[in-house]
Amino acid sequence: MNEKKPYTISETSDGLTSITMAGLTELFKTRGTALSFALALADRVSDRRTGIFHLQDTPDGKLQMIMHKTGNVITFKDYDQAAKLADMLVKDLLP
């Protein structure tokens, strides 16, 4: 039985890679850029090189991921939940 993924990955008609999670969509110029994002999240660090997002802890102990381009905020219950999502994204984005 396959686990339902908490995101969808698709390609737009103009060639961008779209990742939708928690009802929010982020567009990446290439699948490689999306993979870079997923790998950075998997490592639980901000991707300073591309400036795609940063992570911050909330006062109630949760983890927020703030996307720099759109300002979208995705809240995870903890680092483990974020890491699990990232691992799933990496597997789906690898060629």
Annotate the PLM regions:
Residues 1-95:
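Positively charged, low-complexity terminal tracts
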